[in-house]
C-alpha cells in the first residue's frame, strides 16, 4: 500500500492508484531521474508559466509505491499554502484541474476518510 499525502493547506488526501502504470507517468509528463524516480513539476500560473509564483512538485519512487506532493515557490525551495489567500483562487482552480487529470490517468486517487 502506498503512502497518503496532503498538500499544505488542503484537506484532501491522495495516494498512488493501485492501477498505476509506467507509461501513464510518462504520458502525464513525469521525468525519470538518474536514480530511477519519477519527477513532475508543473507551474501554477494565471497568465504566463514563465512568471508563475508557485509550482506543483511530485515525486514517485522507482518502485511506484511512495508519493510526495508539495506546492513550492518559483525556486522550488519554500513550501507555499495557496489555500489561505483568496487572490490565489485561480491557482487553486488550476491545481484542482491538474489533480483531476492525474486521477483520470489512474496515477493518483483521492482517499476517503
Question: Which stretches of residues belong to each language-model region?
Answer:
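Generic, low-specificity signal for short hydrophobic/alpha-helical stretches with a mild N-terminal bias
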Residues: 3-7, 22, 38-40, 80, ...
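Ser/Thr-rich, low-complexity intrinsically disordered terminal regions
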Residues: 19-64
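Intrinsically disordered, low-complexity regulatory regions enriched in serine/threonine/proline
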Residues: 9, 69-113
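Short, composition-biased local secondary-structure segments
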Residues: 1, 61-63, 69
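Terminus-proximal functional modules
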Residues: 4, 14-16, 44, 53-59, ...
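Terminal, regulation- and interaction-focused segments at domain boundaries
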Residues: 1-28, 110-113
Amino acid at each position: 500500500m502506498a503512502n497518503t499525502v496532503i498538500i499544505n493547506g488542503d484537506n484532501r488526501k491522495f495516494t498512488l492508484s493501485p492501477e498505476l502504470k509506467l507509461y501513464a507517468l510518462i504520458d502525464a509528463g513525469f521525468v525519470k531521474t538518474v536514480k530511477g524516480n519519477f519527477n513532475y513539476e508543473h507551474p501554477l500560473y494565471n497568465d504566463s508559466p514563465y512568471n508563475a509564483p508557485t509550482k506543483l512538485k511530485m515525486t514517485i519512487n522507482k518502485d511506484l509505491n511512495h508519493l510526495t506532493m508539495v506546492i513550492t515557490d518559483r525556486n522550488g525551495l519554500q513550501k507555499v499554502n495557496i489555500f489561505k489567500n483568496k487572490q490565489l483562487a485561480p491557482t487553486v482552480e488550476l491545481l484542482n484541474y491538474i489533480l483531476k487529470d492525474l486521477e483520470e490517468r489512474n496515477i493518483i486517487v483521492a482517499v476517503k476518510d
